Regions:
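Short, basic, low-complexity termini and linkers enriched in Ser/Thr/Gly/Pro
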Residues: 190-193
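A polyanion-binding, active-site-adjacent surface
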Residues: 1-187
């Protein structure tokens, strides 16, 4: 995995489309128990080079009930978004992830895993890409029906502040989905084959 990680970090496939230039932000290990696939790094993450090093990351860690030490341990969590670099700002938030990364790099990453990690699909870009025709008609439908995607995938909304209202109007998410997520994460962290 080290050689692959080195190639990913040198990737410049999308450089002409990236306003701040390429800086792929990933965290990988062949032994990871959980794989996080989301959209693309935000500006702050681009600046620090640390995945989920922002308010959304803090909230995601709260949802999973893990601290920074566990979250940034690649033996537990691999992180490879749909787009590895910050795509720039759009009219209502960041632009969509560049379409080149996932098809180019994800299959190579998955080949290097020693086991089969639980894949957290965070947001619609990741869910539509991986669940394809099995994806619900909306993020709400997909997340509500999370059990049908287990044990391979666990779909979640993006934990950004933009989605605070979504969490409020869908109380079942915090009442039912989050406890199940925390249970599965804890089981995987504590399982030593």
């Amino acid at each position: 995995m080290d050689e692959l990680l080195s190639r990913i970090r040198k990737c410049e496939v999308c450089k002409d489309y990236l306003p701040l230039g390429p800086r792929p932000v990933v965290q990988l290990s062949s032994f990871s128990k959980i794989m996080i696939i989301s959209q693309a790094p935000g500006r702050r993450v681009h600046e620090t080079g640390i995945p989920w090093n922002d308010i959304s990351g803090k909230r995601l860690r709260e949802w999973m009930n893990v601290d920074d030490v566990l979250f940034y341990n690649p033996l537990i969590f691999s992180i490879a978004p749909m787009g590895f670099c910050y795509p720039g700002k759009g009219k209502s938030g960041d632009l969509p992830p560049r379409p080149q990364c996932a098809p180019l790099w994800h299959p190579q990453i998955f080949k290097h895993f020693m086991g089969k990690p639980l894949i957290l699909l965070i947001g619609q870009y990741a869910q539509k890409y991986y669940l394809r025709s099995n994806c619900g008609n909306s993020l709400t439908e997909t997340v509500r029906n999370y059990k049908q995607y287990l044990p391979d995938y666990f779909p979640l909304p993006h934990p950004s502040l933009r989605n605070q209202n979504w969490v409020k109007i869908n109380p079942w998410f915090m009442e039912k989905v989050i406890p199940e997520l925390q249970k599965r994460i804890k089981e995987l962290i504590n399982h030593n084959p």
